[in-house]
């Protein structure tokens, strides 16, 4: 029984069950002359239209698949305020000028009845769509045996049975829809099943008339289910879009969502003020995914409304914080959106996939294989055309099989990528449609613009740029102790957004991100021990990203002024102990260490969960003993030390770039005196940092700074390598003139740091090779500069090896690791297996090896 159709026919009859409605009309006509089924249906329509105002012809499904009887698309740009269904005509009403044979024709009325249009509560229906719906409802009198003489009991029983059947069918349809999306294909889903997840909700106005409710008026459970379905659909679309293969039906549904003008996005934006936190979370995810999918077809008003919510409030109360958090989460997800890239380790798999692609399109697969096949492989990225999609070679038989469907796919692809925006269409990047063994029709995208979100990121950043100082000021107020607990989630979202904007991974230009560096030095003043550990940690992440030394600043000749200003301020605050003392500390609770249990025993009364009186009284007497223990989070300490080292390295690099100016003589006495003052200041900062780390982590007072550094970052490879680059650059930058300032060189000594690193890795050349191949650290930059330093200061390197090992053969061990590394790299290069040009490192390794073999001191 088509219960969804039955429900649709009775939607306009108030709260009466569709089954009982049909039964009543049948009883009223029993005393008349015999009539055909069509006459009975028309009689029922006339009676219903006289008794009630016009109502929707069926439940307000978002996917209104039945009204499009002539396969004509409804205009989504020129519809009136009533938004009535388009009448069948010979003209095509679609702004996309899609032929009526298009696959998307059945989704033309997407979102037509989901929401009230422009405040109208009266809905108008078309006779054609009503006839179509009643045709299906006409089956009910023959399928249901209804006795109208049984009174209210029979009426209630039939209504209950109908509701139970409708509920069971809806659950089954919902389960089928979700399982199909899990398999990443909607090709086998019926139209009725596709409607169920997107059904709207009715409410009554002040006059007692039924109308389609706004999203904010929906029940929480139904709203959560609706938003979850949208999120799941968008997530599947984005994953397939990133890989270059999209199920045609998923593509059509998302395309219809993008082209609707029924205020759905505006209604979801209004959910920022919804009381349920789960609804807010889902609404933010849906909006972010929708904006990423829309891209060039983006409505500028959507982004503007999201940005305006950051500032449209009279006071920073809980409601304002909630809306700010909602908008920040959407903008953050847009900025941090990363296009999927192929992993270097997947090259072998891709090669085998390419060699067997033709065979895999013919050989039938099992059920499990067909499901896993829908998780399409990531396509390679040819550099010549900048396309992100891989052009698969199809055999002649495959081309013949898919030849009839190709024109339709080209029309579909052309409509999806900008024909509404009057963009000139080139036939070269047309999608290719293939039928998978599981029965899914897949479109292969070859348009690089379909994968690029740079335009969306730039628009978002530009809209936020001029209002950024105001937002920073508001966030500074929320970080006050009075607001900190209630607004911590909002502050964390803001800090993460700021970090993502200035991050190198965002692929934004320097001019676009420069305004976001201007407020960093003022924001650094907010570092305080009163902040929570999570907020403090995120602030350190923000400043470390601004001073991205290993990935960016170390490779630049001229450093940005805003970055240098932030580095100078941090160095000054370290000298005054302000920033180091601002690290939040906490007292350990029931901490178990190597020397035993440091917490207080908790004694409970027998059979209860309340503390015994003896334990409570004992607590008050022994409060002073364990409270002397102060614990500091190691992650916070790591980020703070790395931030200080980066600031020192940036300061030294800026000084060296200024002093290397051709207008300054290398023997200038005043310049040398300035360098002495700077070196003394840097040495003072490093001494205070070293003392602070030793006191916090309980190192021996005579322990060298290099050992402290290696063991502090022993669980963070990226932080460790970047810290080693900083110490190496500070040493070589300060002492670049005739090995001046030996005190600073002895304090940092990059050779000690390298030897301590080899000791920690057990002299493994394999690990060094892994770090060279990986792009997760800046080890290539470190090794290149270290080898140059060793070659220029060979005597100092040999002497440091002897003093570090206390007479042991540290020189032989260190050079043995470097020689083995050179041999491993040479073998990979000879087989053309190395991923990039490593010849500069090979030449430096050979140069150091020749010095080692000809060195008399070794």
From Swiss-Prot:
This chain's source organism reads: Drosophila melanogaster (Fruit fly)
Q: Where in this protein does the record put region Disordered?
A: 1-102
Could you list the residue ranges that cross the membrane?
none
| Keyword terms, alphabetized | Activator, Cytoplasm, Developmental protein, Nucleus, Repressor, Segmentation polarity protein, Transcription, Transcription regulation, Wnt signaling pathway
Q: Which gene encodes it?
A: lin
Name-wise, this protein is Protein lines
**KW Lipid metabolism (keyword) present:** no
Q: Provide the tissue specificity.
A: Expressed throughout the embryo, including the hindgut, posterior midgut and embryonic epidermis.
Q: Which Pfam families does the protein's record reference?
A: LINES_C, LINES_N
Q: Name one GO cellular component term.
A: cytoplasm
**Where is it mostly found?**
cytoplasm
